[in-house]
Amino acid sequence: MELAHDGPLAIPLWINGRACLTVGNQLFDVVNPVTGVAQHRVPLCGAEESAQALAAARDAAAIWTGLGLSGRQDKLAQLATALEGYSGHFAKLLMADRGVAQADAEAEVVAAVQVLRADKLGQSGVLGLVVGAERPLLAAAKVAPALLAGATVVIKPSPKAPSAAFALCELASRCEFPAGVLNVLHGDGPAIEGLCTAGVDALLFAGEESLLGPVAELAARHATHFVVLN
């Protein structure tokens, strides 16, 4: 994380296997709903950053599909094991962003590990995944079936709870996922619309009901294939 002007630490983007900052000046404070304290900040990205993240995912597609199903299974198994090993750290991230009880945060990490170990095949292609603020780690982990099918992905977490998705992508890099297979783009509507205009193959959604309509409307506006994950 980096300093964001004189405020809290800023969580950078994760694009092409590394953390990167954006030159944009719009920042969103991630406030713990229990304490009311701003834990950190995220940039509110637009079309330029969306296109950059999607290009990284597109460039990674050949090497990721080239691993074959068994190779991708191995990588996801490594990520699940690593997440299990860092379960305490991820639980703390969830507690800080969402203000949930420790038991609830720990249960979410366990559920995310189970999802990463599943053998179901999902959507293929170069995808965007919009994640809500409720159970953000579990929602981000729901990308696993698509990854297993050979998809490369740009995750757009809620600016209210972005830490877990960023940390998951960083952990995937430590597990030697090819650069660009998993990327994180921060922001809200303009970031999602940027993925659509940049030609994402499909937009996946894993979030709360209140966000479903607006995200689906953005996808429909640009004739982008839209999939709701259970």
Where do the model's predicted regions map?
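N-terminal Rossmann-like NAD(P)+-binding subdomain of aldehyde/semialdehyde dehydrogenases
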Residues: 1-123
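Rossmann-like NAD(P) dinucleotide-binding subdomain of oxidoreductase/dehydrogenase enzymes
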Residues: 121-230
